[in-house]
Amino acid sequence: MKSAVNFELPLAVKIRKQIVQALNDFNMIEDGDKVMVCVSGGKDSSVLLALLTEIQRRSERKFQIEAAILDQKQPGFDVSKFKVWVESLGVPFHIVEKDTYSIVKEKVQGGTFCSLCSRLRRAILYDFAHANGFTKLALGHHRDDVVHTALLNMFYVGTTAAMPPKLKSDDERNILVRPLCYVSERDIEELAAEWAFPVIPCNLCGSQDGLKRQRIKKLVRDLEKEIPNIYASIQTSMTNIKPSQLMDQDLWDFKNLKT
């Protein structure tokens, strides 16, 4: 089946170049890699998957791409149309089935599901990737996610931390990469609308109101009206750390500072 994705759209070209920049800056994908793109059926990971296939076609590096989605057995989860779209890209597609929906609904009552759901989902996908010989896991987090996470940690946790572009998983068996780390959510939304691929809604987290991440997003979007480059500025600050100007004594020896 031929893909209906138009890779020559100006916005597709822009995002592809931003992905390539991230791949090069952080050495995300190397010759011989077997990359598992973790797709959710949403706009972010789907745009990533499609553009990685185009980058693969153009690249001198030889690497494999496959997609994997977790069927968590939540009501209304129908992967059939999305599966057809993924296969139209020429990408092998894995549906990993595990009922985490029942676990989350049972364990979390009266709160938000995201934290537990994410931990369970990660563990299952890490196991699948390791068992099937994948060398990299590509995640669909974009620039806005990185910025929102930094502020969430600062406001609610008291740490200066965000989403790194490349890291070793907690179980130390997998390398995770975030090729969309330079790409804005608005650009992804616009391209997804142009391509009009099938989207699988999340009836678990998508049904919750008042999430902290949503509050942070609204805050930054409101500030963006006064500070147009706020997302780029916050992200750039993460590449320009000055330990002597902070308060972490593990990074800077304040006690022994003398003239």
From Swiss-Prot:
<keyword id="KW-0004">4Fe-4S</keyword>
<comment type="function">
    <text>Catalyzes the ATP-dependent 2-thiolation of cytidine in position 32 of tRNA, to form 2-thiocytidine (s(2)C32). The sulfur atoms are provided by the cysteine/cysteine desulfurase (IscS) system.</text>
</comment>
<dbReference type="Pfam" id="PF01171">
    <property type="entry name" value="ATP_bind_3"/>
</dbReference>
<keyword id="KW-0808">Transferase</keyword>
<dbReference type="GO" id="GO:0006400">
    <property type="term" value="P:tRNA modification"/>
</dbReference>
<keyword id="KW-0067">ATP-binding</keyword>
<comment type="pathway">
    <text>tRNA modification.</text>
</comment>
<feature type="binding site">
    <location>
        <position position="205"/>
    </location>
    <ligand>
        <name>[4Fe-4S] cluster</name>
    </ligand>
</feature>
<dbReference type="GO" id="GO:0051539">
    <property type="term" value="F:4 iron, 4 sulfur cluster binding"/>
</dbReference>
<keyword id="KW-0820">tRNA-binding</keyword>
<feature type="short sequence motif" description="PP-loop motif">
    <location>
        <begin position="40"/>
        <end position="45"/>
    </location>
</feature>
<protein>
    <recommendedName>
        <fullName>tRNA-cytidine(32) 2-sulfurtransferase</fullName>
        <ecNumber>2.8.1.-</ecNumber>
    </recommendedName>
</protein>
<dbReference type="InterPro" id="IPR011063">
    <property type="entry name" value="TilS/TtcA_N"/>
</dbReference>
<keyword id="KW-0408">Iron</keyword>
<dbReference type="InterPro" id="IPR014729">
    <property type="entry name" value="Rossmann-like_a/b/a_fold"/>
</dbReference>
<dbReference type="InterPro" id="IPR035107">
    <property type="entry name" value="tRNA_thiolation_TtcA_Ctu1"/>
</dbReference>
<dbReference type="GO" id="GO:0046872">
    <property type="term" value="F:metal ion binding"/>
</dbReference>
<dbReference type="GO" id="GO:0016740">
    <property type="term" value="F:transferase activity"/>
</dbReference>
<feature type="binding site">
    <location>
        <position position="114"/>
    </location>
    <ligand>
        <name>[4Fe-4S] cluster</name>
    </ligand>
</feature>
<keyword id="KW-0963">Cytoplasm</keyword>
<keyword id="KW-0411">Iron-sulfur</keyword>
<dbReference type="GO" id="GO:0005737">
    <property type="term" value="C:cytoplasm"/>
</dbReference>
<keyword id="KW-0819">tRNA processing</keyword>
<keyword id="KW-0460">Magnesium</keyword>
<keyword id="KW-0694">RNA-binding</keyword>
<feature type="binding site">
    <location>
        <position position="117"/>
    </location>
    <ligand>
        <name>[4Fe-4S] cluster</name>
    </ligand>
</feature>
<dbReference type="GO" id="GO:0000049">
    <property type="term" value="F:tRNA binding"/>
</dbReference>
<keyword id="KW-0479">Metal-binding</keyword>
<comment type="similarity">
    <text>Belongs to the TtcA family.</text>
</comment>
<keyword id="KW-0547">Nucleotide-binding</keyword>
<comment type="subunit">
    <text>Homodimer.</text>
</comment>
<dbReference type="InterPro" id="IPR012089">
    <property type="entry name" value="tRNA_Cyd_32_2_STrfase"/>
</dbReference>
<dbReference type="GO" id="GO:0005524">
    <property type="term" value="F:ATP binding"/>
</dbReference>
